[in-house]
Amino acid sequence: SVVALLLGQAIRDGHIRGIDDPVTRYLPELERQDPRFAQVRLRDLLAMRSGIAFQEKYSSPWSDVAIFYLTQDLGRAVAGLKIAEPPDQRYRYSSGDTQLLGMAIERATGQRLHQRVAQDLWAPMGAGMDASWSVDSAVLGQARAFCCLNARALDFARIGQLMLDRGRVGPRQVVPA
């Protein structure tokens, strides 16, 4: 995913120490919600093994994923997340994990995800058109990191080629291999 590429770049650039960092290093408010969030590492979010209770149920308008799609305040939606089990127990697809990862990257780098995509992926890849990332509201501007990156198919194909080329575009290493 694009968020995983941005995480690799944030680590390479020294904004994030590594994938074994607890998410609470970047989102300390989670630990105030529930001290067990301190056990959740970026690695757990990346692998969707966080143990966070998150309903990925697209048929229900009241599921967590529906709330994340519709909310105008993702920060408030994230504040409602709960720990269901210790991290790294089992894989469970979770848009919530990707959202937390995106928020941690933004907090660590001091940049919005769409800014990082534009300068650190799209420009070096030679993308044909700008991408846009849907946000919770014009006022808050929090990217819906779990979805909603809008771009041309050709530019998404460039991401695939970037991965096939081990993160390189010509001689330039765009993302860590």
Annotated model-derived regions:
Residues 30-33, 64-65, 86-90, 102-107, ...:
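Second-shell loop/turn segments in exported
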Residues 1-19, 45, 101-105, 156-162:
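Active-site SXXK
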